[in-house]
Amino acid sequence: MEELFNALPQPLQQLSLALAGEIPLTDHIFEQAASTWHVQPRSLTYKLLDHIPFSTPVVVPPSIYHSLDWSKCFAVNQDRVERVPTIDDPDDVYVPNSDIGPLLTSLHTIPDYGFLHPAIENDATTLRAERARCASTFYKIASSQARQVKLDPIRMLGFLLLVQARPRVPSGLVTDQPTRRDPTQSPALHAIWQVMQYYKVAGVYYAPALVVPSGAIWWIPPPGKRNVVSVQYLLTDLINLAILAHMTDMSPTLELTGVLMYLRAASSHSHAYTLLQMKSVFPALSLRSMYRNKGFGGKAPAIEWTEPRSKYKFRWTGVTQLHDGLRPRSPSMDVPTLEVLTKYELVDIGHIIIRERNAHPRHNHDSVRFVRDVMALTSGMYLVRQPTMSVLREYSQVPDIKDPIPPSAWTGPIGNVRYLLPSVQGPARHLYDTWRAAARQIAQDPQWHDPLNQAIMRAQYVTARGGSSASLKFALKVTGIVLPEYDDSKVKKSSKIYQAAQIARIAFMLLIAAIHAEVTMGIRNQVQRRARSIMPLNVIQQAISAPHTLVANYINKHMNLSTTSGSVVTDKVIPLILYASTPPNTVVNVDIKACDASITYNYFLSVICGAMHEGFEVGNADAAFMGVPSTIVSDRRSSVAPYSRPISGLQTMVQHLADLYAAGFRYSVSDAFSSGNKFSFPTSTFPSGSTATSTEHTANNSTMMEYFLNVHAPSHVKSASLKRILTDMTIQRNYVCQGDDGILLLPHEAASKISADDMNELLTCLRDYGQLFGWNYDIDWSDTAEYLKLYALMGCRIPNTSRHPPVGKEYAAPQTDEIWPSLIDIVIGHHLNGVTDVLNWREWLRFSWAFACYSSRGGYTNPKGQSFSAQYPWWTFVYLGIPPILLPGQTPFIHSCYMPPGDQGMFSILNGWRDWLISHASTTLPPLRHNHPVWGLSDVPSLLSQFGVYAGYHAAQHYRRPKPAPETASSDSINQITSDLTEYLFYDSALKARVMKGRYNWERLSSSLSLNVGSRVPSLFDVPGKWVAAGRDAEKPPPSSVEDMFTSLNRCIRRPTHSFSRLLELYLRVHVTLGESIPLAIDPDVPQVAGADPANDDHWFKYTCLGDIPSATRNYFGESLFVGRVVSGLDVEAVDATLLRLKILGAPPEAFIAVLNGIGMSDSEAHQIAGRISLANAQLVQIARVVHLSIPSSWMTLNTGPYIHHHAYDFKPGITQPSAKSRDKSIWMSPILKLLCTSYAMTVAGPVRTSIVTEIDGSAAALSGNLRVWMRDV
């Protein structure tokens, strides 16, 4: 696009050349381009579109500029501003497509743009005038919807156009294919250009809204024009689609269908509402309707779920040859989807997609790429609605229970609970028995009566997040209890950290009033889902929820196949959905609609509380639990002879929990988007902010499914073949769930899929069953696996790129004034999303660098009007995980998108660049006076300094969130809150005695002349201070802290140290070379991930060489090795690393005991763990963590474990120099060297090759000694 390139300002032309791989990127290019972007008017980006000669069939209808009168969409009801549906659907409560212009007053700095007229806001807040309140609500919610972006969409469009202005140069890999995307053929870009013609006045483009740090400001149109808010949302959707279309190499035909849907939504009465109604269209026409015609074939993986299934180990066993007998038997979704599209006059786009889909009868790389591309068309907008409406819509629901539990099913009351009579049968009996059995196990398990485990439970909700603090304070004040304040500590007052300190010295029985305190409102905006309100409980409410959490955790760990217990997505879920979707398996996706609202005291909670209370009877009735004492309760099971008896602390907690659940919660709503909307709303809905919520739902989900499979279905279905299938099904083998989400795996018979008739009968039976106890099962049988918003088709993962929108980001609060460096973390997360979603890696890398360039520059103006600014060097982003496109002396695009971040990535880059650096320094710079441990006499450090490597390296590690300045807080107040948090943590004197003993013994041992193992080890005494620090970090930083951050950052960049960290300098002594390509782990014709195909070569090579079934994920990359759980505030990985470090340094057994006592463990548990600490027992990665090496998240979808073991060589005879061989006593060096080898192999684009240590500067023994010295100094 020569014309587009020539239209760019000269600094951006230079950046475009660098991102095309024509010239190396330099700090000068980077800084000049960033400066240009920040000073030029945003509208110039739209002007660039004038230089693209579009040729697409898109025609933007004038109806997108029509306005619905906002005053008809809002009304005051019961002194609340509410969104009034304008069509016959109560869900029509989203931002209307209305003109915002008449509500605006001009900004002094940008007179063409404005904000809500102060008179309107004054009338709304002071006079409470109804029309003004409605106007204010419309303005604020419309502005919030516009703000759901990472930064102004115009900027993101600018990044795309800069990438498209210059085609990239070939990389040298024979598989490198140029992009087929032509901007002139982009319907999304063409639509943007057409839309903006309406906003062109006197030759100047005006965006409908400008997104600024504090929100959005809106264009004030001239007479005769409108500014309909939905046009801004339309532009956001179109820009998002244009980016994804380029990054996926999407066909213009498919892109056109997405554009037409967005235009239709913009022409409707409400853009967001219409998109929500059509959110399932694109998945239904692609993922859920593939391969329904004859001629089906191709290859799919053969995956085995090894026994026992509870271990979640899967392995690739070969290839399944697909044929018509394995073709999906579920009906396509075409008919119901076309009906939806017909309603919105979009049936043509359905026919276009169906025609394109029918061109892919066989399962191959092209067909799954088609599915991925169609799913990417769904809008990625975070949907906003008035928080008031979220509460009224979601928290007023009451489940319709067809088979309620009659009053006669219960015993007389035991305090606040009742027990289910033995004569009662059915699902309620099974639910009761399951929870009672699990409660008995908890009551009899000594580990839960250990003070450390109880402290872990008490600490899990002590976080910087909010937790209804004002309501807690008010509820206790009514009873005469005044909580202490720590105003001068600068700890965030609304945090649970602050709450925990306040109640630490107050006996539980005096805090009971707080159990019924109101719960304040939180809000979460979501992609493709309704915004949902959340209920953050206070610390007392969380505390009494502990039994609920404990028992549910036991059910999930020991009784079902849940994925909540210690799992990560890549550990269990991805292999699971791949397995489930592979023929001849039949999979059903199960979701419980409105699950929170379906868990009420009328059925579930009364059963659960009674069951837990009865199960806890087997425990010691005099035992306290988590500081809750034993109490006396009136047992009136016998109305003739009621009596009082003691109950344990656990049972006391259940008593209060039952009382709370029976009464329901009161939701304190303070809607910041609606002036005057403050009200209290009673609800029976289960609180989304409880620590028990997810695990509780999981336990119920599995328990009710168990009864269905074992009892209900066999007695209700008629089909003999279905009855036979059900006899082999259990929740331990066939049902996996998490929260309200589940996946049902049906066994096949003789490699034949279950019949459609049997499936329909089973699913009808399941729907009817759920209605017995008020559940609405949303069942999807489409021969695809969907679980936790991850998708698979025929054993191939389908990334849902629309859920990781390049433009979108959630902002739930009306004020979103973030400090600039936080944008850098957004850039890195954005880049990683594109790697995980397997976007075309070279184009995505170019886009990420454009985004990084813009975000590298930022400023701050303090309340006094003083300005501060800073500019990050480009090497900062290399350290953070974005690989360079072209380095001097190299060819472009040779660094893989799987390059690890941090020192591992820097080692890998420098290891491959080493020879050129030494050669270039030797010929252009004088030699060093003294031999450098890594570079010899070549003055490479000066060369790296000239390239800005050191400046970028150190700037990357500089803090990006302002630090609380010590002088802003009173030391007395800090000491007081720390003391109270210490009291909260060490409420049990036995725990404190353990930690004191551990600290005393450690200090005695570490000061011994004969024990040189360093002095810093984790301790439970550190935790209160860490809580205070976290609470201060959560508070909005004062201007002085922001100024200090800018000053410190600029000092770091301008005067960097001319060396790397001690560890990286040691890593660089290791020379790694690559050998032959490793044998392919997977048939290259088998699709593993949509988009990882020959057209996207680096992803394809990595997946075919390594495979996507992480056979050893838990073994190699488990979060903990020796210590399972620690108190919130301690890092379990840091504890494990400390223990391994001590083992490497030869510490005696008593040193391990002291460390473990110091984190709260009893002597017996400490001795057990100390006896297990062995370097031989540790896995590779866990030993490597001692020196801060790890497995980056981008590798976790790959089976890298076997590579590390079998293809990364720390020593290979004939290649590795003898001096690089580790001695037997330094056997711990091997994992470190192997991970460095793997890091380098994964950083090179192309096939994965063997990696070999060839030499170690100074010898392996010297490196080992230096690493030991570093360990002692940590």
From Swiss-Prot:
Entry-linked InterPro entries: DNA/RNA_pol_sf, RdRP_5, RNA-dir_pol_reovirus
Domain RdRp catalytic span(s) in chain numbering: 561-798
Catalytic activity: RNA(n) + a ribonucleoside 5'-triphosphate = RNA(n+1) + diphosphate
UniProt GO molecular function: hydrolase activity; nucleotide binding; RNA binding; RNA-directed RNA polymerase activity
Cysteine disulfide partners in this protein: none
Record's keyword terms, sorted: Hydrolase, Nucleotide-binding, Nucleotidyltransferase, RNA-directed RNA polymerase, Transferase, Viral RNA replication, Virion
Transmembrane regions listed in the UniProt entry: none
Top-tier EC class: transferase
GO biological process: viral genome replication
Cellular component GO terms held in the UniProt record: viral nucleocapsid
EC number of the protein: 2.7.7.48
UniProt xrefs under Pfam families: RdRP_5
Keyword Hydrolase (UniProt): yes
Subcellular location, record wording: Virion
Function text: RNA-directed RNA polymerase that is involved in transcription and genome replication. Following infection, it catalyzes the synthesis of fully conservative plus strands. After core assembly, which consists in recruitment of one capped plus-strand for each genomic segments and polymerase complexes, the polymerase switches mode and catalyzes the synthesis of complementary minus-strands.
Protein family (similarity comment): Belongs to the reoviridae RNA-directed RNA polymerase family.
Protein name: RNA-directed RNA polymerase VP2
Species this protein is from: Aquareovirus C (isolate Golden shiner/USA/GSRV/1977) (AQRV-C)
